Amino acid sequence: YYAQDFFDENKITVENQALGGMSSRTFYTRLWPDVRKGIQKGDWVIISIGHNDNGPYDSGRARASIPGIGKDTLNVTIKETGVKETVYTYGEYLRKYINDCRAVGANPILMSLTPRDAYDENGKIVRVNKTFGLWARQVAEQENVPFVDLNEISAAKLDKYGPWKEKYHFYTDHIHTSRFGAMMNARSAAEGIAESKDPKLALLQAM
């Protein structure tokens, strides 16, 4: 939400295709086919996903991806439905999004996850720079696409606010943000794009 507030509305239209509860796997299999139909040449596609990539592979919500960025696969049968599915790594799902965007001439951008309301032993917001953030960065480097460390940018802001202010940026589940948190993350994403040294973002930076 609110990303449109940080771009020139005369130059760019922002469409938010996110849906709560999706993982890199379930968004790709369930929602991406329709989203992909609307992507056109020259579009910019921001990909930031992974909060729900844990859990069971073959039961319940069955939305987990395999950790990492390798080429590992897992063939599963969903217990509740009997549907068979091949599960890929988190990084491989990111590559699928990237390849699909490039196939129609669109410009993918990878961003690390928005931070959770969780603290380390020093009272700082926990980063994902050893898991999903690292994997997104690695895939971006491998595929030569822009990467914005949204997790770090927003977490640094929350660290400055302190716990008494941070609580106003999240709901009680410690994951979903309030209006204030959503605005902060949108601003962080825009700042990450604006301050990037990646020449591939030069055109978007002008918008």
Question: Which residues make up each language-model segment?
Answer:
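Generic structural hydrophobic/aromatic packing signal, biased to beta-strands
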Residues: 3, 14-17, 182
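A short beta-strand-loop structural module common to alpha/beta enzyme folds
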Residues: 10-23
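N-terminal post-signal-peptidase region of extra-cytosolic proteins
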Residues: 23-34
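Alpha-helical cap/lid subdomain in secreted, periplasmic
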Residues: 33-179, 183, 188-205
